[in-house]
Amino acid sequence: MNVKQPTDDELRFIAAEYHLDLSDDDLASFQGLITGSLAAYERLHELTEPKPEVKYPRTPGYRPEPADNPLNAWYYRTSIKGAASGPLAGKTVVIKDNVCVAGVPMMNGTSALEGYVPDTDATVVTRILDAGGEIVGKAECESLCFSGGSHTNENGPIRNPYNPAHTTGGSSAGSAALVAAGEVDMAIGGDQGGSIRIPSCWCGTYGLKPTHGLVPYTGAFPIEITIDHLGPITATTADCALLLEVIAGKDGLDPRQYDVKTEAYTQALSGDISDLRIGIVEEGFGWANSEADVDASVRAAADQFAALGATVGAVSIPMHLDGQAIWTGIATEGATMLMVKGNSMGHGYVNGDRIP
């Protein structure tokens, strides 16, 4: 039997922990209930787990030599060609190494996972291939994606293509670096607290953290379900909208997705923006660790929207000042439950091999 029937002594021990005193009749009653439940669990154990089809042939690829990987941005290189036609036909795409690509090694920046090879594709991977894109490899990321720098990866720091002595930002460090260097057209990144946006800013690419739940996270290594996001990193806004159009929408598998509404994002790239209102958060500027020229650059970029006809104005969100503290609590507690106790599988996960 997959799960063994508890003994009466074990039931008494559990009951005592809850300050319950069970009679022999109580124990017999509970044992009867448990027997019926265990039969159901035994049947569940016998059922074959359905797995999404791996639709496109591929090889595991290879780990590039340092001479061919000067930014240390590639984890693995491969070539997985998708459909013969589609909106991404002719586009090369690299996938952040916290996202599963069947048959291709994945370590999520840490030696703890080195040697792991997924046997299914993440939903975003399947959608990219169905749209005609070619996946050309996995991009290095920070250790378990828990850094906004580019220095915690087990294989060494990921270097900025504009100045190798500078950080790329993280945790989607390799994704942004490879796009900025022109080695790929597009990348998939992940974002829990800036991990698409930070490296995109520091590498001069376009990165978008989509609305929560818009893009399915199915098949990606999580941190906490309320802050997990996958999104595009590209060299142009047009490609950013195009990739988002391909990967957005429900997949019926991701509990992060609820009332998902997709749009034709590429059609929103031109036209009148006079009805667009943009708020500049006052509390986002002037921090002790802020740089004045960066603050000025952000405000200048906002002014460009005003010049194009949008309404741009200051807004105050005082709680923004506590955002990092709030995020730290959510991410730490969530990661403990989901990544550590849940083995990245979810709350209440139990490894069947450990059940006596």
At which residue positions do the language-model features occur?
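Amphipathic alpha-helical segments in well-structured domains
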Residues: D121, T205, D295-R299
